[in-house]
UniProtKB/Swiss-Prot annotation:
High-level lineage: Eukaryota, Metazoa, Chordata, Craniata, Vertebrata
Compartmental location: Secreted
Disulfide bonds: C5-C55, C14-C38, C30-C51
Domain BPTI/Kunitz inhibitor residues, every copy: 5-55
Matching SMART domains: KU (SM00131)
Name the UniProt record assigns to this protein: Mambaquaretin-2
């Protein structure tokens, strides 16, 4: 699994409402969150499938 999968979820400071997914090292699962649209990190995926494929394996 890439190291960025272990980054904490980061919605960012902007006020957008974008559906996204992140990997949780604690649960070994992908979860949904609302991304604000700016200054997040690499642990953010457009689909849960992409998150699972990249981080869960």
């Amino acid at each position: 699994r890439p190291s960025f999968c272990n980054l904490p979820v980061k919605p960012g400071p902007c006020n957008g409402f974008f559906s996204a997914f992140y990997y949780s090292q604690k649960t070994n699962k992908c979860h949904s969150f609302t991304y604000g649209g700016c200054r997040g990190n690499a642990n953010r995926f457009s689909t849960i499938e992409e998150c699972r494929r990249t981080c869960v394996g």
